[in-house]
Amino acid sequence: KRGLAAMTSSFSAAICAAFGKYDVVHFHAEGPSVFLWIPKLFGKRCIVTIHGIDWARDKWKHGFGSRYIKFGEYIAAKYADEVIVLSEKVQKYFKKFYDRDTVLIPNGVMTHENRKANLITQKFGLHKDEYICALSRLTEEKGIHFLIEAYKELKTDKKLVIAGATSDTDGYVKMLKEMAGDDPNIIFTGFVSGQTLEEIYSNAYVYVLPSKLEGMPLSLLEAMSYGNCVIGSDIAEIADVVEDKAILFKKANVEDLKEKLQMVCDDVELVEKYKSEASGYICGRYNWEDVVNRTVEVYRGKKSCKEKLVENSSVASI
């Protein structure tokens, strides 16, 4: 089981960090934070980044996994020198349930050059602007089943590309493929990276993120950095990022998603409007250089890092 492997790896890493010549130990997510006390005993400065409320994810909702992850969340809130969060929603959550002040440092993204369709044409028969794209881990909270259901009711000749791999969710992936049936226009690419990933982002007509639950989705930032028109669910973790630069639908509402998809399929000019605004906006507001500088401040213990990250328009041109 990957969960057990992750647990033992986190324990081993915490031991190595405790005895290693490190000043700061940075834990990512609640699960590994269970072992934060080990390097803490050795006088290390311990930082935790909370990427989302992981114990609430569908695959952990019941049983030991959820309780274990929530215990790690408690350890992080109580004992970490600093807790970094990626969204205001999670920041409010830690204040409400643990009375813990946190540092808000969202994910960042770099500007990207768009690639012409080459590998994706050879591998999957895809061409520019001829497909709707979703890219994520194939887990239930990502809402891909909503997208397939909505897509099957569309009047369009555009294909649906679902890029991503299972995450201990083989049963869910099997269900998705059963929903798709023998429709040749629904394409599962599996895990993609490198040039193939870049080409998928670069040539999509629309990028869709139908999640029920998120931390701060890096794939959303990447999709917009490539100049994509985005349709996302109206959860705070997406809506707060995109503001008015993307199209939102009601979370888990297949009918509303279908209407938004049909709208963009029928209105090329609307899609081009969102595409023209996406990259400049997202790369200006969520710049990796800012993220790195603020994270280093947290490592050093500067209190100024607790100020909310604001848009720096001069960075957008870099």
Model regions and ranges:
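Membrane-proximal helix-turn-helix segments that form the acceptor-binding/catalytic region
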Residues: I15-A18, L41, G65-V83, F97
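Short hydrophobic beta-strand element within catalytic cores of glycosyltransferases
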Residues: C229-G232
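Glycosyltransferase donor-sugar binding loop
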Residues: V109, L135, K159-K174, G190-F191
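Aromatic "clamp/platform" in nucleotide-sugar-dependent glycosyltransferases that forms part
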Residues: K212
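Nucleotide-activated donor-binding/catalytic signature segment of Leloir-type glycosyltransferases, i.e.
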Residues: V173-Q195
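Conserved donor-binding/catalytic core segment of Leloir-type glycosyltransferases
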Residues: G125-K155, V161
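Conserved acidic donor-binding segment of nucleotide-sugar-dependent glycosyltransferases
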Residues: I247-V254, M263-E269
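Short alpha-helical donor nucleotide-sugar binding micro-motif in glycosyltransferases
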Residues: F191-V192, E199-A204
